[in-house]
Each structure stands twice: as structure tokens, then as C-alpha cells.
UniProtKB/Swiss-Prot annotation:
GO terms for cellular component: chloroplast thylakoid membrane. It catalyses: a plastoquinone + NADH + (n+1) H(+)(in) = a plastoquinol + NAD(+) + n H(+)(out); a plastoquinone + NADPH + (n+1) H(+)(in) = a plastoquinol + NADP(+) + n H(+)(out). The keyword Ubl conjugation does not apply. Its main location: plastid. The chain crosses the membrane at residues 31-51, 57-77, 99-119, 124-144, 149-169, 184-204, 229-249, 261-281, 295-315, 323-343, 354-374, 395-415, 418-438, 484-504. PANTHER family: NADH DEHYDROGENASE. This is NAD(P)H-quinone oxidoreductase subunit 2 A, chloroplastic. NDH is composed of at least 16 different subunits, 5 of which are encoded in the nucleus. GO terms for molecular function: NADH dehydrogenase (ubiquinone) activity; quinone binding. It comes from Nicotiana tabacum (Common tobacco). The gene is ndhB1. Belongs to the complex I subunit 2 family. InterPro entries: NADH-Q_OxRdtase_suN/2, ND/Mrp_TM, Ndh2_N. It is a multi-pass membrane protein. Signal peptide: none annotated.
Length: 510
């Protein structure tokens, strides 16, 4: 009899849980429609992989790309809708979050064509690669809209775990295994530090997990100026610093960039930063609203260290991917200026604008590196000498992307940095902007050094890799070259027509 009653209670509880989940999905599911498209794409990929043979491989790429494009379209149709909080306060939909989701989807859409030829040449498992990319994208999108500490952590780990698996995808490569181990250990440590900071917020706010409720809880408990908030701020800043590759938490970045497959590095170099920036803007702006002076100071120190160390160490590198790793550390130092300025002086708008330009510049550079690596098998900067004599199109494309990264006019990188530094100057961050200008000059030096190598025609400087360089048939590399052309064009002309981009970014601010 007792067993019968317990069984009935279990059935009733299960039914209630199911009905509540069904109610949430029915009424709140439309608010995560772009994410649902990606989930449907993931299911389709699994079904095709289980029921098809090698002849259906193009369908896998088609489904992945189509689901990403459809998700972008769904986001665009939802633009300028009223902000909504759904799933019992766990997820927030507004224009500011959707801008970051759009950037993550754009990165993934451009990265898949970069991977096609590389995967075929290295004989990597295609389905699993695409699954990890889409799942990481999904985690990044949920991270952009997460509105409570638990959802933030789950979405962050969804993205991070896929990143670890992607970095070690070429498991027969010793460097890839080493990169994965370092990435996993450092990433796990940073997540632990971040969660420890979250636990302080949870305790000080009286047991609240929603971001806005944490602020209310801190006011009610009179803990918003307590030493505990400073402890939480330090731990959360360190955790986010690892995710953003800010100095001095950047140690994992060069090894992961060098050891991971190049398309994976291209993907991680932009999506991880966009997702972490989406998290940083909300974490610092909402729960730490009363500690703005403290986190401004912390971020200023990290930005200065990143700009100086990243650009100075990049000069000494001999590997193209390691050079871009240190360059990315310097670049994120510039972006931090936008976070410090905030939405009062267009800081967030300048950050979003520069990240859009950075995506095109960085992915264009990596597209060139993928092509060169497939045709020569090397990543050494010295081996790029004389490339212009063999492949002028690739050499010019790489030169334009590097010049844009350096911030030379009239390319997009120049206008992006100009807007970012101008916002910083207007906000009174004079020292930070001066450091940014000086380190930008340093970065131009090592970018020009590579471009000089590309354009050299002296035989004694040309290595056997370029001397024996052979262009592959266009048909085999058209997807990589398509991504490269799109990124090069964007890196060249986006800055000239940046006013509409700035207007959209300003319109998204909460």
C-alpha cells in the first residue's frame, strides 16, 4: 500500500515537471528560435551521419551552413523587439545580447568554409567536427543571453568543452595533444575561479542567482560595499581574464594557437572572445554596478599589460600562428577600453564595431594561413618569403588583412581603432589611449616585417617551400578562397561605410 502511494506521488511529480517544462517550451520557445534552429541542425547532422555514406559529405556542410544562416535570419527578423525575460528568469532577449549572438553566428558561418579542404587533407572526422562547432556556437549564444549564474556557467562550459575537444582534434599530432592538455587544465582552473567568485555573489546577495536580483539582494543585505564584493570581483575578473586571454592570464594562448588545427584556431580566436565579452559587459555592469571604480582600475591594468606584452612579444615570434596569438592578446587590450568606457560615451558601440572589423581581419588572415599551409605544409614566418612571386592574390590578401590589423588607413582596422580610442579619450582615459596608440605602432612594425617578406623577390631569401609552391586547382579550394575574399573585402571597405554599423551598435545598447 505504501509503495502504491509513493508510486502515485512519483507519477504526479513527474507529470507536473513535464507539464511545467512543456509550458516553458511552448510559451518561451519562440524567444530562443535561433538557438532551436541550431539544435535542429545538430539532430539532422547526427541522423545523416548514421544513415548515409561518404558520398553525402557535402550535405553535412550544407546543413551546418544553412542552419547558421537561418539562425542569423531569425535574429535579424527579431531585431528591435521589446526586451524579454523568459524561462523563469534564466534567459534574457534584447538587442544588445542579439548583437553578440549575431557576431558568434557570423564567425561560425565564415569558419565552416575554411575547414572543408583542411579536414579532407588531414582526414579528420567531419561529422564530429561540425557537431562540435555548432554546439560551441549554441553554447556561446546561450551565454550571450544567460541571465543567472547557473545558466552562465552551463553555457560557458558547453562552449569550453567543445573548444577543448576541437583543439585536440588531430589526436595523432603531439603538439595538438599538448595544446589540448594545457587548454583543458587552464580552462578548468579559470572556470573554477570564476565559479568561486559567483559563490561569493550568491552568498552576499542572500541566495540570489539572477543578475538583477543579485543587485537587489546586495542592497537589501547592505553588502554592496563590503570587502566580500571586492573578493568576488577579483576572482570573477581573473576567470574572465583567462577566457579573454588577457595578460597575465594569457599563458595558454600561444601554445593552443600553435598546436591546434588552423581552422579551429580561427574559430576560437574570434568566437571565444565575443562570447567572453558578452559575459564581461553584463557581469561588470549589473552585479558590480556599485564597484565600478574598482573594476575599472582592474581592467585598466589588465588592458595595459595586454597591449604592451602582447605586441612586444609578438615581434620575436617565428611561427605565424604564435605571432597571431600574441597579436590577439594586444587586440583584446584595445577592446577592453570600450568596456571601461561603457555605454555613457559610446564605449560599448565602439567595442561592438571594432569586434566586427576584428572578425573580418582575423578570419581573413587565418584563411590565408590555411591556404598557404595546405600548399606548403609550413607555418614558419620565414617561409612566406617571396610568396608574391608565386601567388600574388594570396600575398596581397594576407598583406591587406595584416595592414588592417595594424590599423593603417584607409582600411577597416584604422577606423575601428580610431573610434575606440576616440571614445576612450572622450571618457578621460588618456593614459590608456596613449598606450594603445604606441603599441599599435609597434604592431605595425611586425606586420610590415611580414609583408616585406611576402613581397621580396631576392632568390637567396626565398625558401624551398615557396620555390616549390604550386597553386591547387581553384575548384578544390573555392570554399576557403570564398571566405578569404569576403573577409578581405570587409577588412578593406567596412571602415569607409562604418556610420550605419555605429548607428546599429548604438541602437542596441540597453
Amino acid at each position: 500500500m505504501i509503495w502504491h502511494v509513493q508510486n502515485e506521488n512519483f507519477i504526479l511529480d513527474s507529470t507536473r515537471i513535464f507539464m511545467k517544462a512543456f509550458h516553458l517550451l511552448l510559451f518561451d520557445g519562440s524567444l530562443i528560435f535561433p538557438e532551436c534552429i541550431l539544435i535542429f541542425g545538430l539532430i539532422l547532422l547526427l541522423m545523416i551521419d548514421l544513415t548515409s555514406d561518404q558520398k553525402d559529405i557535402p550535405w553535412l556542410y550544407f546543413i551546418s551552413s544553412t542552419s547558421l544562416v537561418m539562425s542569423i535570419t531569425a535574429l535579424l527578423f527579431r531585431w528591435r523587439e521589446e526586451p524579454m525575460i523568459s524561462f523563469s528568469g534564466n534567459f534574457q532577449t534584447n538587442n544588445f545580447n542579439e548583437i553578440f549572438q549575431f557576431l558568434i553566428l557570423l564567425c561560425s558561418t565564415l569558419c565552416i568554409p575554411l575547414s572543408v579542404e583542411y579536414i579532407e587533407c588531414t582526414e579528420m572526422a567531419i561529422t564530429e567536427f561540425l557537431l562540435f562547432v555548432l554546439t560551441a556556437t549554441l553554447g556561446g549564444m546561450f551565454l550571450c543571453g544567460a541571465n543567472d549564474l547557473i545558466t552562465i556557467f552551463v553555457a560557458l562550459e558547453c562552449f569550453s568543452l567543445c573548444s577543448y575537444l576541437l583543439s585536440g582534434y588531430t589526436k595523432k599530432d603531439v603538439r595538438s595533444n599538448e595544446a589540448t592538455m594545457k587548454y583543458l587544465l587552464m580552462g578548468g582552473a579559470s572556470s573554477s575561479i570564476l565559479v568561486y567568485g559567483f559563490s561569493w555573489l550568491y552568498g552576499l546577495s542572500g541566495g540570489e542567482i539572477e543578475l538583477q536580483e543579485i543587485v537587489n539582494g546586495l542592497i537589501n543585505t547592505q553588502m554592496y560595499n563590503s570587502p566580500g564584493i571586492s573578493i568576488a570581483l577579483i576572482f570573477i575578473t581573473v576567470g574572465i581574464g583567462f577566457k579573454l586571454s588577457l595578460a597575465p592570464f594569457h599563458q595558454w594562448t600561444p601554445d593552443v594557437y600553435e598546436g591546434s588545427p588552423t581552422p579551429v584556431v580561427a574559430f576560437l580566436s574570434v568566437t571565444s572572445k565575443v562570447a567572453a565579452l558578452a559575459l564581461a559587459t553584463r557581469i561588470f555592469d549589473i552585479p558590480f554596478y556599485f564597484s565600478s571604480n574598482e573594476w575599472h582600475l582592474l581592467l585598466e591594468i589588465l588592458a595595459i599589460l595586454s597591449m604592451i606584452l602582447g605586441n612586444l612579444i609578438a615581434i620575436t615570434q617565428t611561427s605565424m600562428k604564435r605571432m597571431l596569438a600574441y597579436s590577439s592578446i594586444g587586440q583584446i587590450g584595445y577592446v577592453i577600453i570600450g568596456i571601461i568606457v561603457g555605454d555613457s560615451n559610446d564605449g560599448y558601440a565602439s567595442m561592438i564595431t571594432y569586434m566586427l572589423f576584428y572578425i573580418s581581419m582575423n578570419l581573413g588572415t587565418f584563411a590565408c594561413i590555411v591556404l598557404f599551409g595546405l600548399r606548403t605544409g609550413t607555418d614558419n614566418i620565414r617561409d612566406y618569403a617571396g610568396l608574391y612571386t608565386k601567388d600574388p592574390f594570396l600575398a596581397l590578401s594576407l598583406a591587406l588583412c595584416l595592414l588592417s590589423l595594424g590599423g593603417l588607413p584607409p582600411l577597416a582596422g584604422f577606423f575601428g581603432k580610431l573610434y575606440l580610442f576616440w571614445c576612450g579619450w572622450q571618457a578621460g582615459l588618456y593614459f590608456l589611449v596613449l598606450i594603445g596608440l604606441l603599441t599599435s605602432v609597434v604592431s605595425i612594425y611586425y606586420y610590415l616585417k611580414i609583408i616585406k617578406l611576402l613581397m621580396t623577390g631576392r632568390n637567396q631569401e626565398i625558401t624551398p617551400h615557396v620555390r616549390n609552391y604550386r597553386r591547387s586547382p581553384l575548384r578544390s579550394n573555392n570554399s576557403i578562397e570564398l571566405s578569404m575574399i569576403v573577409c578581405v573585402i570587409a577588412s578593406t571597405i567596412l571602415g569607409i561605410s562604418m556610420n550605419p554599423i555605429i548607428a546599429i551598435a548604438q541602437d542596441s545598447l540597453f
